[in-house]
């Protein structure tokens, strides 16, 4: 019997022994459940299954770090244009004689070691500081960021289930939108859910700058934001204390960031 055959028989024996020791072993679930809510009350109405690979990924801080560093690198403009020694304004003459002073040898006033001297490694704009990351690694970071928000109870999905026939509260809808344009409608939402000191991120399925919610969010600055689903980065997901996402946007994220594994 060859070595490969012996190895195969050994592995099969281990599998059989494991099955006999754990006769009632269970297969882990493939899906987790996300709650569908109405807006702005966030009243739950139904649940729908989401694959574990998307919303139940194990937390990997090293992968999140790689994604955030790449995003910040790519945001750098690279417009700095510091003067080098040849561009600086001072004379090229030595500040002191080479010998006879009892002091260390010095060059001209453009030396980088001098106060108000030139830059040793000057660059000429535009400078490209962008870095790259494998697509599969970035997709993993995105899934980890969403899974972290889901496990921490920070993710709220707004939408309607096809089979559910729940009744809505007055002023509610299954769309991520305010039903009226009252100037304090969003203030009521923030106060009711205790979000005054938290960062809130809204991600609609289709961004409309003329929508009531988009206009209301624009008055809040950086504390309450709304982004197009195509513009959301890993940093945005990690910075938000509450993620209010439409079901269409969540389906879009699932299709985009699990295409290499499902």
Identify the residue ranges that each predicted region occupies.
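Extended polybasic, low-complexity segments that bind anionic RNA or targeting/receptor surfaces
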Residues: 2-73, 124-262
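Residue-level signal for pocket-adjacent positions within structured domains
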Residues: 45, 50, 83, 90, ...
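A short, flexible low-complexity segment enriched in Lys/Arg and Gly/Pro that occurs
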Residues: 59-98
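Short coil/turn segments at secondary-structure boundaries
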Residues: 83, 100, 129-133
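Glycine/serine-rich anion-binding loops at beta->alpha junctions
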Residues: 88-120
